[in-house]
């Protein structure tokens, strides 16, 4: 395999560093060996890692064919390959960089398994299962478990979780108890389903492999066959793993098998964007990287090129309140863009008013030149989308639902609508039964229960049915004499009015589906306790399990905030329906940021939310005012908004805790190492009674 010339390498190495900030440059030129790049949201991660690969190749440290880069989505792998080809095509990097292998874990494993299979397994052939559903349904039937579609999908997801965590069927029951996990079926029943499923995949001289098996068999081949391992490790010498906070134990096992005793590994991630633990992902490997490799080079990318300083400031405060070991690795981002508008916090009386208010705000942004395709409404669960779909439809604003179907296009909603139509066509319905009771009676056989069922798919189906029941109740409340036939007609009209998805429309997406994306304007909607954090994260768990679940919800909120480039609006409603009891509370994650100054929006009712300073004693209130005076003077000196120095929430915490030294000050949410170094002495002087002005 040819190596690039020294002259070409020197030219390319110089060109590759052009336009990089100091931290990005440090990551690119870090020596071969264990390297950990902690990359915050918007910090140019993809640009950095592709240039690191190109630098290693162009500088002659490793040949392009000896590099394997892996990530978690086909889209991310494709983007990495495109960037490398562009660097090669433009002469910035060695031409061979365009041939570097950048794949998902599963794609890389399948390629390797096809090559090594005959030597490892022999004459037994294998086929990749394109769908697990039929096999899991058959396994469930044999185990006398539920075989309705949602149950089968939940059983499938649980098998995937168990395999990703390296949990064998016989170990499942003890594992779910140890991890405090809700099983979609009684553990002993699920164990039989899991066992049956694994047995069904083997038939004579043919094996069916699912995507997890690709990883399992690849790891086993390298672990158990020294000749195969030596050949693979001679081919691939240098590895890079993107989104390392989302790796599963099974993926780490494959990575360890690839590496052997070597340490030429670069990992990139942000533990505070860990939001997929329900799939088996764990940030533990990222958290322990320096422990495993004490000599590792660690680089922190903290310059945020995506969002305005105002959005970055809020994001820092959100994650600054995090607790637990993951929070110890948080990155305090530093906004690099010009100043923009302050994030807006808006309270509404009910959900419909909230959705209409968001639609009106979108109209205003459109009038100011923000394209619909550069705006997004993000929410915690897919079932929340209906009210926003309706508001956008009524406002004639185009939209698309990402990572899911439109509300009326979902299978469970279509089935429920069919049942309601059938009920409306009956002639034997009693006239004295209230419409809400009639609707509930129709929906109960389709899965509407008092409490959410276990299992992700079953819960999502239930959430859609609850949303449909609530929509029917709201329509009935607005029209007291509404009949079931009229209700069905109204629902059908709403379904028909939803325009087909359009590429250039406003994006509606769950927070999970929004990961990795960004927009000029983002609306984080429905931010009430029980929705974010989600009710089952609060649940009846206690101790570490409950704390971990709530902290993952906080990280999900953080991911939502960091999707916004410029305009960020956070909204919540006090009641579900118009005129309903205002029993809802804003998300607990909003508590430190509720309106306390002129920079935030008034609530829709015209009343301000209670400020976060109400609990301060007179001395604390006086200190808060002095801190505000200092902040204003400092902001003027730096020519930045006061929000960028410290938020009101941070000043309130300082006034409450009155830290005596830097060690105490840095523990306060919103004060990281950078702000401690920059403002710490001045703040402590104000706390001690002087230094204002």
Language-model regions: role of each:
Residues 669-672:
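Small-residue hinge/turn detector
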Residues 37, 43-53, 64, 294-297, ...:
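Helicase P-loop NTPase motor core
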Residues 1-122, 126-127, 230, 284, ...:
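P-loop NTPase Walker
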Residues 18-29, 33-38, 48-49, 68-69, ...:
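Conserved helicase NTPase motor core
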Residues 31, 96-99, 118-199, 204, ...:
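ATP-hydrolysis module of ASCE/P-loop NTPase motor domains
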Residues 2-12, 16-19, 55, 249-348, ...:
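Conserved RecA-like helicase ATPase core segment
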Residues 611-660:
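C-terminal accessory/binding modules appended to enzymatic or scaffolding proteins
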């Amino acid at each position: 395999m040819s190596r690039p010339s020294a002259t070409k390498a020197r030219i390319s190495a110089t060109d590759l560093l052009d336009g990089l900030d100091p931290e990005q440059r440090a990551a690119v030129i870090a020596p071969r060996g264990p390297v950990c790049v902690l990359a915050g949201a918007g910090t140019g991660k993809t640009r950095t890692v592709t240039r690191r690969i190109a630098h290693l190749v162009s500088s002659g440290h490793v040949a392009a064919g000896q590099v394997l880069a892996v990530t978690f989505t086909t889209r991310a792998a494709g983007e990495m390959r495109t960037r490398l080809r562009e660097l090669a095509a433009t002469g910035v990097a060695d031409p061979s960089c365009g041939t570097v292998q950048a794949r998902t874990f599963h794609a890389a494993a399948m390629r390797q398994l096809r090559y090594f299979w005959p030597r490892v397994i022999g004459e037994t052939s294998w086929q990749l299962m394109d769908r697990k559903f039929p096999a899991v349904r058959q396994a469930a039937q044999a185990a006398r478990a539920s075989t309705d579609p949602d149950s089968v999908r939940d059983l499938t997801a649980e098998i995937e979780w168990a395999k990703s965590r390296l949990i064998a069927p016989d170990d499942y029951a003890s594992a779910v108890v140890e991890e405090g996990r809700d099983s979609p079926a009684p553990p002993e029943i699920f164990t039989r389903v899991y066992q049956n499923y694994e047995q069904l995949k083997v038939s004579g001289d043919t094996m069916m492999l699912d995507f997890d098996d690709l990883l399992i068999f690849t790891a086993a081949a390298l672990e158990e066959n020294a000749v195969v391992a030596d050949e693979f490790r001679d081919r691939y010498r240098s590895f890079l793993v993107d989104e390392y906070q989302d790796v599963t134990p099974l993926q780490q096992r494959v990575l360890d098998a690839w590496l052997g005793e070597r340490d030429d590994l670069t990992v990139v991630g942000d533990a505070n964007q860990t939001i997929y633990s329900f799939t088996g992902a764990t940030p533990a490997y990222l958290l322990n990287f320096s422990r495993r490799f004490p000599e590792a080079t660690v680089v922190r990318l903290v310059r945020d090129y995506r969002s305005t300083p105002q959005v970055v400031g809020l994001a820092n405060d959100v994650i600054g309140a995090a607790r637990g070991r993951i929070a110890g690795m948080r990155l305090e981002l530093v906004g690099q863009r010009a100043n923009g508008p302050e994030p807006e916090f808006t309270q509404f009386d009910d959900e419909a008013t909230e959705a209409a208010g968001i639609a009106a705000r979108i109209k205003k942004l459109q009038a100011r030149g923000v394209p619909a395709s550069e705006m997004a409404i993000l929410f915690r669960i897919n079932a929340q989308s209906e009210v926003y779909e309706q508001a956008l439809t009524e406002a004639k604003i185009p939209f698309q639902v990402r990572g899911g179907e439109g509300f009326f296009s979902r299978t469970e909603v279509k089935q429920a609508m069919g049942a309601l139509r059938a009920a409306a066509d009956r002639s034997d319905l009693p006239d004295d039964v209230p419409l809400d009771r009639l609707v509930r009676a129709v929906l109960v056989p389709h899965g509407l229960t008092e409490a959410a069922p276990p299992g992700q798919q079953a819960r999502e189906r239930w959430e859609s049915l609850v949303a449909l029941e609530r929509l029917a109740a709201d329509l009935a409340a607005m029209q007291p004499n509404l009949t079931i036939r009229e209700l069905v007609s109204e629902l059908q009209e709403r379904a028909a009015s939803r325009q087909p998805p359009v590429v250039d429309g406003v994006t509606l997406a769950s927070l999970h589906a929004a990961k990795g994306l960004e927009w000029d304007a983002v609306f984080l909607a429905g931010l009430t306790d029980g929705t974010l954090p989600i009710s089952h994260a609060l649940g009846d768990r206690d101790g570490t399990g409950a704390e971990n679940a709530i902290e993952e919800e906080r990280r999900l909120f953080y991911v939502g905030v960091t999707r916004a480039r410029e305009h960020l609006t956070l909204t919540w409603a006090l009641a579900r329906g118009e005129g309903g009891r205002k029993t809802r509370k804003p998300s607990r994650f909003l508590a430190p940021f509720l309106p306390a100054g002129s920079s935030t929006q008034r609530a829709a009712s015209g009343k301000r939310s209670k400020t976060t300073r109400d609990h301060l004693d007179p001395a604390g209130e006086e200190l808060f005012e002095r801190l505000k005076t200092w902040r204003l003077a400092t902001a003027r000196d730096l020519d930045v908004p006061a929000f960028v120095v410290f938020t009101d929430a941070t000043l309130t915490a300082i006034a409450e805790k009155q830290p005596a030294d830097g060690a105490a000050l840095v523990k306060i949410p919103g004060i990281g190492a950078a702000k401690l170094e920059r403002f710490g002495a001045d703040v402590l002087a104000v706390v001690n009674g002087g230094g204002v002005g």
